[in-house]
């Protein structure tokens, strides 16, 4: 049973769940586990722009150096940049201090192995066992303590990496781009990358103060970006989240393009170019049925996983896919990155736009999403989904939807909530089905 790690590292209220004491122990435990071989061991640490990042970074440095690991400090950098630099700098482990799209009061710790991939369940459980144990006998001697060093050239390294995901002949000349960096980790690298590729760049969400990350900006609050795109008559808007591992696109009309539409546009282009390593892509159970029908219409298949980019990536690696993601904008292109990379995904989409010489709206709106309704049911205890009345209601709902829709019911991984989602061609039927299941779950949870 997991105590500290969730589906995306350790996350919670800063100085509540994520305390200096916990960060110290995480550094010590991870340092002990990844000290293999007889070379000098080191860890790469990046963070987003939250005020609590300083506190957590300092505690992690103390933890890693106390067990003999050297620390390379990157400062504010996107999560995918930390994963890339972990590999590039031959580090034994990478750490990202971020709570992604959450408000500034929260923070988190994500860990990457030397290959740049997030740690598997077994390693996370091993780290948990050490966190809760006695580390005193694992500490390094006075002569063997690690050293910490701040690296200055990391922004240029990541910018060059992002640019190299495009062929050298591809530029963004002639595109007016508004980029919203959520006052987060990409506030320096994203505008600079786009400018170096030739775009006219208007940057918003690039004034972090420790408190304003994700506040009314970024991929989870794109209204200001929509307004700016329309106001400036820009060709495209790009919204990243606080750690820049997800992206949302806004077309020249101010219409939002979610992860499903983005994956559809890229999949169509990659199929034409014979770039897909498997005849399809990987998405989650929450992706719209319209995406599945569009992908099937291309002669491709859509594999579905549980919610969470780690499950998408696991399926991609196991079955050899190079494209996958989530409706929320976590897009994984494994030819380039070991995790979701919002900037790289945006660049790949813009390369399709440039090649086809069409407006973003014509490239990105590949299918009409089916009506989708999601409702949450809170419960205090027990397992309401096991109740006979709920099982019967779910079976009846699926029969009513038939082949024209889908029903997805799942417990939240972070709170006592059951999510009921249905989609289908008939909006009225979808609404009825959701209400019936919600009523049954609510009664069972009472």
From Swiss-Prot:
It catalyses: alpha-D-glucosamine 1-phosphate = D-glucosamine 6-phosphate. Mg(2+) binds at residues 100, 241, 243, 245. Keywords: Isomerase, Magnesium, Metal-binding, Phosphoprotein. The modification Phosphoserine is found at residue 100. SUPFAM superfamilies: Phosphoglucomutase, C-terminal domain, Phosphoglucomutase, first 3 domains. The keyword Phosphoprotein applies. Binds 1 Mg(2+) ion per subunit. It is an enzyme of class 5 (isomerase). PANTHER family: PHOSPHOGLUCOMUTASE (ALPHA-D-GLUCOSE-1,6-BISPHOSPHATE-DEPENDENT) (PTHR42946:SF1), PHOSPHOHEXOSE MUTASE (PTHR42946). NCBIfam families: glmM (TIGR01455), PRK10887.1 (NF008139). This is Phosphoglucosamine mutase. The lineage of its organism: Bacteria, Pseudomonadati, Pseudomonadota, Alphaproteobacteria, Hyphomicrobiales. The gene is glmM.
């Amino acid at each position: 049973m997991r105590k500290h790690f969730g589906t995306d590292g350790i996350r919670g209220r800063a100085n509540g769940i994520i305390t200096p004491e916990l960060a110290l122990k995480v550094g010590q435990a991870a340092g002990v586990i990844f000290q293999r071989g007889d070379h000098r061991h080191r860890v790469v640490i990046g963070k987003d722009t939250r005020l609590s990042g300083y506190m957590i970074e300092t505690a992690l440095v103390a933890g890693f150096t106390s067990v003999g690991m050297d620390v390379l400090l990157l400062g504010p950098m996107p999560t995918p940049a930390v994963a890339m630099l972990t590999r590039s700098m031959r580090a034994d482990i990478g750490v990202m201090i971020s709570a992604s799209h959450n408000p500034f009061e929260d923070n988190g710790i994500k860990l990457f192995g030397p290959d740049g991939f997030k740690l598997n369940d077994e390693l996370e459980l091993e780290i948990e066992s050490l966190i809760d144990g006695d580390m005193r006998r694992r500490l390094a001697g006075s002569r063997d303590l690690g050293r910490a060093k701040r690296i200055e050239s990391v922004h240029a390294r990541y910018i060059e990496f992002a640019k190299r995901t495009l062929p050298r002949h591809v530029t963004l000349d002639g595109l007016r781009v508004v980029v919203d960096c959520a006052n987060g980790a990409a506030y320096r690298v994203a505008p600079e990358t786009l400018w170096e590729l030739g775009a006219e760049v208007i940057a918003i969400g690039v004034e972090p103060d420790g408190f304003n990350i994700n506040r009314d900006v970024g991929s989870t609050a794109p209204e200001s970006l929509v307004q700016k795109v329309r106001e400036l008559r820009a060709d495209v808007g790009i919204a990243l989240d606080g750690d820049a591992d997800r992206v949302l696109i806004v077309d020249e009309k101010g219409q939002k393009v979610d992860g499903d539409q983005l994956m559809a546009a890229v999949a169509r282009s990659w199929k034409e170019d014979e770039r897909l390593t498997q005849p399809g892509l990987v998405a989650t159970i929450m992706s719209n049925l319209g995406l599945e029908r569009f992908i099937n219409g291309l002669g491709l298949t859509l594999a579905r996983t549980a919610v969470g980019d780690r499950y998408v990536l696991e399926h991609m690696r196991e079955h050899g896919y190079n494209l996958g993601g989530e409706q929320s904008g976590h897009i994984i292109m494994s030819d380039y990155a070991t995790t979701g990379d919002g900037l790289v995904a945006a660049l790949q989409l813009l390369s399709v736009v440039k090649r086809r010489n069409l407006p973003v709206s014509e490239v990105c709106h590949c299918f009409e999403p089916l009506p989708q309704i999601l409702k949450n049911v809170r419960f205090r205890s027990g397992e309401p989904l096991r109740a006979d009345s709920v099982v019967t209601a779910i079976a009846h709902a699926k029969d009513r939807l038939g082949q024209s829709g889908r029903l997805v019911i799942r417990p939240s991984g972070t709170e006592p909530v059951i999510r009921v989602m249905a989609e289908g061609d008939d909006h009225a039927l979808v609404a009825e089905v959701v209400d019936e299941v919600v009523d049954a779950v609510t009664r069972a949870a009472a």
